[in-house]
A protein has these predicted regions:
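Solvent-exposed coil/turn segments that connect beta secondary-structure elements
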Residues: 26, 49, 65, 77-81, ...
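Acidic, glycine-rich catalytic/binding loops that coordinate metals and/or anionic ligands
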Residues: 2-4, 9-10, 45, 91-104, ...
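A residue-level detector for short acidic-glycine micro-motifs
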Residues: 23, 46, 62, 88-91, ...
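Residue-level structural signal for beta-strand termini and adjacent loop
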Residues: 34, 66, 89, 111-112, ...
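Short hydrophobic beta/alpha edge segments that flank linear recognition/processing sites
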Residues: 44, 73-76, 101-113
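Surface-exposed, glycine-biased beta-strand/turn segments
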Residues: 1-71, 102
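Zn2+-dependent peptidoglycan hydrolase active-site motif and core
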Residues: 37-40, 54-93, 118-123
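...with weaker cross-activation on analogous glycine-rich loops/strands in unrelated enzymes
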Residues: 61-63, 81, 95-110
């Protein structure tokens, strides 16, 4: 069941997202290298196969695999310079060009790419600039 806030923004994993944040946006200790570096999104620990939902209505612009980083991932353009990214998925369910509504299942969570365990890496971009997803989630 989608969890959609008053502004129409949907949590990609449901209403319990606050209890499963394992890495915030911003500087952190990289779990693979142990070095301090920026983290471009928010990591939400969920079991492999958890349905991932579109945060807002929009059009899928990327649905592919990136070996060195996001693994299987999807990007959605929501218009007005706003886009979201969903990384480390085990399965992609939405192809490029598909129009989605807030709450539509677009992928299943996983641990593909540069990952230490099953989770969703969730990004929000405004005019191409990564911004803190916590500011948008309901």
């Amino acid at each position: 069941m989608p969890f959609i806030g008053a502004d129409g923004f949907c949590s990609p994993i449901g209403e319990n997202w606050r209890s499963v944040v394992t890495s915030e946006f911003g500087n952190r200790i990289d779990p693979i290298t142990g070095e301090r570096r920026g983290h471009t999104g928010m990591d939400l620990a969920v079991p492999t196969g958890t349905p991932i939902r579109a945060a807002l209505p929009g059009t899928v612009t990327v649905s592919t695999y990136n070996r060195g980083g996001y693994g299987y991932y999807i990007m959605i353009d929501h218009g007005n310079g706003l886009s979201t990214l969903y990384g480390h998925c085990s399965q992609l369910l939405a192809s490029v060009g598909r129009t989605v509504k807030a709450g539509d299942v677009i992928a299943l969570s996983g641990s593909t790419g540069r990952s230490t365990g099953p989770h969703l890496h969730f990004e929000v971009r405004v005019n191409g600039q990564r911004t803190n997803p916590r500011s948008y989630l309901p």
